[in-house]
Amino acid sequence: EALLNLKQYKEMMEDIDAVLAQNPEEETAMLLRGKVKESNGQGEEAEEDYKLVTEINPFNEQAYLYLGQLYINQKKLTEAIGLFDEAIELNPNFAEAYKERGRAKLLNGDKDGSVEDMKKSLELNPKEEAGLNGEFKNLGPKSEALPGIF
């Protein structure tokens, strides 16, 4: 993701801060603030926001997803997989959590587990196949990268 320019960043943060001033436990605003911080290279601050949402509402599967995605980028693959497990436990039909867990498993060397998760993701969201085509382009022909899916 491209870094936000300084003006955009300041405007977004002002808007988010205004919402949080009215309701300090507004989960969506905290998640958005985390995403803005993450896209601006502030991973530790983003992590704090995502974790805070899981403390306020341990049933917010989106917070576990975002934190897991951040951990993939930080190469904390085992931790990421655990967070995706949590998101899936909260919402067994959460296709994006299966996809991201599959990506983390693949990066962690668990090709079979990755294939299983990707199949489940496609079962839940068949429109995602085009997105998966690009996801694994660096792994060689998709039939070799993830046999059994394509």
Which ranges hold each PLM region?
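Terminal, low-structured helical/coil segments at or just beyond the last alpha-helical repeat
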Residues: 107, 112-150
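Helix-start (N-cap) detector for alpha-helical repeat units in TPR-like alpha-solenoids
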Residues: 27-28, 61-62, 95-96, 129-130
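Canonical tetratricopeptide repeat
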Residues: 5, 32, 66, 100, ...
